[in-house]
Amino acid sequence: AKGYNGLALCDIRNGDYDSALDNITKGLPTATTDEMQSLLFNEIVAYEKKLDFATALTKAQEYVDMFPEDSAAKKELAFLKTRTSSEG
């Protein structure tokens, strides 16, 4: 799972968000809790970079429900709520 997260980060940096999402999906089944947290956060980032704010918002809400102690994710969730409500 760690390797897939690394690949996903490279894909995000290179602007290949679909490949990043594919690598995240491949990494999730074998991920430890910490790896899953990283993969799922990067999934939010990838959807946001694709300008798919609705999906990013859904993923961010699920993430915050699973990892409520993650303050960065809470800020991301608040940001995404502003992006989706203004598109509405």
Language-model regions, residue ranges each:
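Register position in tetratricopeptide repeats
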Residues: 13, 49, 66, 82-87
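Short coil turns that delineate tetratricopeptide repeat
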Residues: 32-34, 68
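Start-of-helix register in tetratricopeptide repeats
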Residues: 2, 35-38, 72
